[in-house]
Amino acid sequence: MVNKSPRELFKVPAAWSITQIMAGLTKALDGTGPALAFGPSNFTQVDPEIAIVMPTSGSTGVPKEVALTAPALLASATAAHKYLQAEPGQHWSLLLPTNHIAGVNVLVRALSLGTQIVESNFDFTSIVPTQLYRALHHDAKLLDSLKKAEAVLVGGAAISLDLLDEARSAAINVVTTYGMTEMCGGCIYNNEPLGGVEVQVRSEGRIALRGPMQAREYLGVNGPLADEENWFITNDAGYLAGEKLFVIGRTDDQIISGGEKISLETLDSHLNSEYDVEFMSCAIPSPEWGQSLCLAATNYFNIEEIKEKIRRKFGNPAVPKFFLENVELPRTSLGKPDRQKLANKFEMMYP
């Protein structure tokens, strides 16, 4: 008889070492220990099939709790290793936090290769564009390690073509990745779907994905994670050229800066409720951050005060990089924020 009793959900302590996390993750995957929550959770139990619970990345939006099964996590690792032609005994290095799926994926991949995480002389690692930029411009030690690696996965945010060219010119074998927590992280490598991954681009340009690494559900959310044909409908827009997927941006008001999602509408609403000045945010391309957050207002304001208020409320990733004061905020004919027109103004001011 199949055991359908709930499984304990254990919140991974911040003080745990990588060795402790790996031990707990091993038991979560093979079913001999509790499921693990890699972030704040409102739950203490989950269905027995669930191995880990991950918060969706986000500093201004409300994170959802994504429930992932062991078969999904292992399918993701297997597909990644097949693409990378990885072999048992090769090593991964962890350069990302474990409260993001990309960090946990590194641990799962190491376990599937039968090795421990190493800090140097690694074969593979996963980073965000900001880390790659800093390696090329500031961090000689990291740069040396990346150049020696067989492959360096870069995802979590859009990477500029200039940064990609610079990295490859420096002899770093960059593999660009696209995915999300709901698909166990990256499932598109160098614009190509990993094994078992299916891609659609709907009529409105919205990307839809499905595959064996798909998440089971959002905890505490009524309704399915996917549609009736098990397609996960993303908030990203893109197009297909043959078998390759090209992502061109978001369909909502979110941006990704330094690997963190930021809701522009949430940020604006908070500031506009706190001040008599009207604020509007937007983003411009950045080789270091992927996208740099910008903030404009209809009057003058204390920039340092605003930065500190945003930092306390939403965290460091949501602090704007550029400011414009006492300007007219552009709007569409329907009265909605025209963020693209505002971004054009910032690009002229901060080329």
Label each region the model flagged:
Residues M1-G39, L74-S93, L113-D123:
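Conserved ATP-dependent adenylate/AMP-binding module captured primarily in the ANL superfamily
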Residues F38-P55, P88-Q90:
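Conserved pre-ATP/AMP-binding loop-to-beta segment of ANL
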Residues I50-T78, Q85:
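Conserved AMP-binding A3 loop
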Residues A67-A75, H91-K141:
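AMP-binding/adenylate-forming
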Residues H138-N190:
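Gly/Ser/Thr-rich phosphate-binding loop
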Residues P193, R202-N230, R250, E260-I262:
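Conserved ATP/PPi-binding loop(s) of AMP-dependent carboxylate-activating enzymes
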Residues G211, N235-A318:
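AMP-binding/adenylate-forming catalytic core of the ANL superfamily
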Residues C282, C294-A296, E308-P351:
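Conserved C-terminal "lid"/linker of ANL adenylate-forming enzymes
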